[in-house]
C-alpha cells in the first residue's frame, strides 16, 4: 500500500495550522490548538476521500518518521530532540530502542502477519459494552468474532449514594458465562481500578488468560493475592507486540495516561480492525518513558480501521490536556514559597508520575519523604521493584521517623484526595492517625480533581483541614489523564475509522465525542452512541444493535457478591430514610384469635413515649386487620402478614406522611 503525498501534505498543513502552539510545552496548553473546525475539515477532505487499503505498507519508514519521531523541525518538542532522547533512555524501563519507528520496532513475525492481514467480506463482529457507558467506572467491553471472544478490561465502580452499604459494583458477566467456551482471553489497557478492579471477582466464575503490560499485571497480581487467588498465570506484553487469541489478533500501542504502561489496542478481526484507545492523553513530554506512539495510530489508520472505541471523558473540554510536567513546576513553586512549613501531598496512589515528581522535588529541597496509606505504599513498592520509580538514596523515611526531623525538612505523600472517610488524609484531619495529625501551619496539597459524585466528600475534607488552620492548595495542582477535544480530533483524524464509538464517559461526554468525530469526517450515522448491554453487530457497510444482554451491575457488600439486590436495597433505603416498625403479636394456632399484643417496636421511626396516640391508633389498625382475616376463615398467615403490613403502611402514611419498613411478627400459641 502506498502512502499518498496528499495525505502527508495535509498532515503537515494540519500541524502548522493547529498544533504550532505545542512547540513550547511551558505555554498554557488549554489555549493551544483552538483553531476552527474548518481547518480539520479541510484536512479530512483529502484524508477521507481516499478509501484506505487493507494491505500493510512495507515501505512506510519515512511516513512514520513524518508523523511522529522524525527530525522535521516543525514538529517542535515532541520530535526526537537529543534532550528528549536522553531523558527517555534514562527513564524507560523497556528494552525497545528509543527513537525507532513503529516499522523498525516490529518483529519479522508481526510484519508478516500485517502484510498478509486482509478482512473478509461478509464477516461480522459483535461489540458488546458490559459497562463503562453513562458513568465513570466499571469498564468492560466484549469483542466477538464468530466463535472467538476477547474481553477488554474488567473494572469496578464505586457505589452511588443510593447503594447503601455497598462497597463496590462489578459488571454482570452473565453473557460471558453463557459463552464461556468462546472466550480466548482478557486484554487490559492499564492498571486503574475502573479497568482491573473486578478481575478477582470475575476470575472466580470465569477462567481465562489475562494479557497486559508489566505494571498493569503487577497490580492485578497484587489484587489476586489479596483475594487468595494464587498460581494464576498472567501474560506480560510489550508495546507493539501482537498476540493471537483464537482467530483474533491484538496489538498493544503505547499511550500516555495518569498511570504508566497504559496501552491502546488494535484488534484484528475477520471483519476488520477495531481500535480501543483505553484511557489516554497526548503528552509530548511525559515524566516517565516515551510519548504516545502517534505513528502507530497513523499506520493502523492507513490500513483501514473499521471501528474506533475512544475515551470520551474530557470531550467537553476544549483545547489540549496539559502535560504532566507542568504540575512539577507548580510543586517547585509551592516548595519554594513554603520553605518553612511541613508539606503534605495527597493524590491518587496509582499516579506514579505525580508521586515521582513530588519525591524529586522534595529531594531537591533537601526534604525527607514519608509515604502514608496502604494502597500508596503498595503501588510505590511495586513500581520501585519494576524500575518505574528511582528514589534518591536517603530520601524515604518511615513515618515513625518523622519526629527526628524538623517540619520544614519533611514531606508526606498520602492517599485520601477524594475525601474517603477511612483514607490516610481524612484520618489525619480528624486526629485519628497514630503517627501524623494535621496542625496549624501545615501546607496540604490536594493534587487531584474530585471524581464525579465525590465533590461533597472532598469539600468536607477541605473544611476539616481549614478548621485545623492548615494552608490548603488545590488549584492548578492537577492535570487530567484524559484527552481534551483537540487531542480527540487528532486521534480520530489519524485513525480515520469507518465507525466512531465513544466510550468511557457519561452520555454528554460521549455525545460531544461523537460530534468531534463527525467534525473530522466520520459520517454522522456512523457515530454510534451505544448503551450498556447493547449487542452491536457490524457486517460490511452496516452496523446495527441486534440484541441486548444482562448488564446491571452486581453489588459487592463485604464478602457477599450479588446477594444484595433491588429488594434489599429498597429495604435499606426505607430504613435509612424512615426507620422501621416491628408489630409483634401472639395468635391462637387454631382460631387465629389475638392472645397477646399487638406490641409496637419503633427503630429510627418515632420516639415511642412522645407518640402514644400514633402507636395506639396503629394497634387499632392491626386489630381490625386480624378481625378481617378471621372473618375470611383463612388459614394462611402469610396472607395475614401482608394484610397487616398494607394496613399499617396506609395508616402511617395517612397520619404522619412517612413510609417506614413494617415487619409483622406472629407467634402461634
Which residues does each PLM region occupy?
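C-terminal tails and terminal domains of large nucleic-acid-associated
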Residues: 633-641, 645-669
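Conserved hydrophobic residues forming the short capping helix/wall of the S-adenosyl-L-methionine
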Residues: 224, 517, 652
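Conserved beta-strand scaffold positions in the cores of enzyme catalytic domains, especially
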Residues: 127-129, 234-236, 307-309, 444, ...
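Hard-cation-handling environments
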Residues: 317-447, 451-617, 623-633, 641, ...
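Broad gene-expression machinery/nucleic-acid interaction feature
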Residues: 247, 262-264, 580-582, 662-664
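His/Asp/Glu-rich metal-coordinating catalytic cores
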Residues: 92-185, 192-404, 423-437, 456-459
Amino acid at each position: 500500500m502506498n502512502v499518498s503525498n496528499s495525505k502527508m501534505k495535509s498532515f503537515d498543513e494540519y500541524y502548522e495550522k493547529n498544533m504550532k502552539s505545542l512547540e513550547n510545552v511551558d505555554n498554557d496548553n488549554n489555549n493551544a490548538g483552538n483553531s476552527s473546525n474548518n481547518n480539520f475539515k479541510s484536512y479530512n477532505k483529502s484524508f477521507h476521500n481516499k478509501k484506505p487499503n487493507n494491505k500493510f505498507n512495507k515501505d512506510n519508514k519515512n511516513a512514520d518518521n513524518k508523523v511522529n519521531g522524525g527530525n522535521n523541525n516543525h514538529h517542535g518538542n515532541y520530535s526526537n530532540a537529543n534532550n528528549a532522547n536522553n531523558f527517555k533512555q534514562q527513564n524507560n524501563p523497556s528494552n525497545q530502542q528509543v527513537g525507532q519507528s513503529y516499522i523498525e520496532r516490529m518483529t519479522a513475525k508481526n510484519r508478516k502477519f500485517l502484510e498478509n492481514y486482509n478482512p473478509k467480506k461478509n464477516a461480522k463482529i459483535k461489540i458488546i459494552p458490559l459497562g463503562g457507558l453513562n458513568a465513570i467506572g466499571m469498564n468492560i467491553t466484549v469483542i466477538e468474532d464468530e466463535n472467538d471472544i476477547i474481553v477488554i478490561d474488567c473494572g469496578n465502580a464505586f457505589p452511588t449514594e443510593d447503594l447503601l452499604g455497598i462497597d463496590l459494583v462489578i459488571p454482570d458477566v452473565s453473557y460471558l458465562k453463557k459463552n464461556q467456551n468462546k472466550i480466548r482471553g482478557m486484554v487490559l489497557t492499564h492498571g486503574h481500578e475502573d479497568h482491573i478492579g473486578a478481575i478477582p471477582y470475575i476470575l472466580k466464575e470465569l477462567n481465562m488468560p489475562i494479557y497486559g503490560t508489566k505494571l498493569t499485571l503487577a497490580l492485578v497480581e497484587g489484587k489476586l493475592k489479596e483475594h487468595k487467588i494464587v498460581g494464576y498465570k498472567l501474560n506480560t506484553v510489550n508495546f507493539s507486540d501482537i498476540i493471537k487469541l483464537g482467530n483474533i489478533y491484538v496489538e498493544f500501542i503505547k499511550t500516555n495516561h495518569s498511570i504508566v504502561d497504559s496501552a491502546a489496542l488494535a484488534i484484528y478481526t475477520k471483519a476488520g480492525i477495531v481500535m480501543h484507545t483505553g484511557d489516554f492523553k497526548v503528552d509530548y513530554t511525559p515524566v516517565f518513558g516515551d510519548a504516545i506512539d502517534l505513528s502507530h495510530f497513523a499506520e493502523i489508520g492507513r490500513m483501514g480501521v473499521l471501528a474506533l472505541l475512544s475515551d470520551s471523558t474530557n470531550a467537553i473540554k476544549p483545547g489540549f490536556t496539559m502535560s504532566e510536567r507542568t504540575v512539577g513546576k507548580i510543586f517547585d513553586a509551592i516548595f519554594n514559597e513554603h520553605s518553612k512549613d511541613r508539606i503534605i501531598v495527597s493524590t491518587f496512589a496509582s499516579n506514579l508520575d505525580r508521586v515521582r515528581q513530588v519525591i524529586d522535588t522534595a529531594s531537591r529541597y533537601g526534604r525527607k519523604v514519608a509515604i502514608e496509606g496502604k494502597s500508596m505504599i503498595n503501588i510505590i513498592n511495586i513500581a520501585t521493584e519494576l524500575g518505574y520509580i528511582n528514589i534518591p538514596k536517603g530520601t524515604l523515611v518511615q513515618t515513625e521517623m518523622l519526629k527526628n526531623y524538623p517540619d520544614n525538612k519533611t514531606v508526606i505523600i498520602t492517599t485520601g484526595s477524594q475525601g474517603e472517610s477511612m483514607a490516610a488524609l481524612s484520618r489525619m484531619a480528624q486526629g485519628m492517625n497514630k503517627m501524623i495529625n494535621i496542625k496549624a501551619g501545615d501546607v496540604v496539597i490536594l493534587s487531584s480533581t474530585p471524581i464525579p459524585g465525590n465533590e461533597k466528600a472532598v469539600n468536607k475534607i477541605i473544611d476539616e483541614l481549614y478548621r485545623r488552620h492548615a494552608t490548603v492548595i488545590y488549584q492548578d495542582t492537577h492535570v487530567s489523564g484524559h484527552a481534551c477535544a483537540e487531542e480527540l480530533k487528532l486521534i480520530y483524524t489519524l485513525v480515520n475509522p469507518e465507525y466512531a464509538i465513544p466510550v468511557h464517559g457519561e452520555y454528554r461526554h460521549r455525545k460531544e465525542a461523537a460530534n468531534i468525530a463527525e467534525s473530522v469526517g466520520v459520517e454522522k450515522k456512523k457515530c454510534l452512541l451505544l448503551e450498556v448491554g447493547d449487542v452491536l453487530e457490524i457486517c460490511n457497510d452496516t452496523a446495527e444493535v441486534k440484541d441486548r444482554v444482562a448488564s446491571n451491575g452486581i453489588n459487592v457488600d463485604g464478602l457477599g457478591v450479588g446477594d444484595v439486590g433491588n429488594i434489599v436495597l429498597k429495604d435499606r433505603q426505607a430504613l435509612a430514610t424512615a426507620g422501621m416498625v416491628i408489630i409483634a403479636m401472639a395468635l391462637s394456632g387454631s382460631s387465629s384469635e389475638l392472645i397477646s399484643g399487638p406490641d409496637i417496636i419503633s427503630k429510627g421511626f418515632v420516639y415511642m413515649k412522645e407518640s402514644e396516640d400514633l402507636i395506639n391508633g396503629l394497634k387499632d389498625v392491626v386489630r381490625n386487620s386480624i378481625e378481617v382475616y378471621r372473618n375470611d376463615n383463612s388459614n394462611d398467615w402469610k396472607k395475614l402478614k401482608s394484610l397487616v403490613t398494607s394496613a399499617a403502611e396506609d395508616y402511617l402514611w395517612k397520619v404522619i406522611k412517612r413510609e417506614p419498613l413494617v415487619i409483622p411478627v406472629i407467634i402461634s400459641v
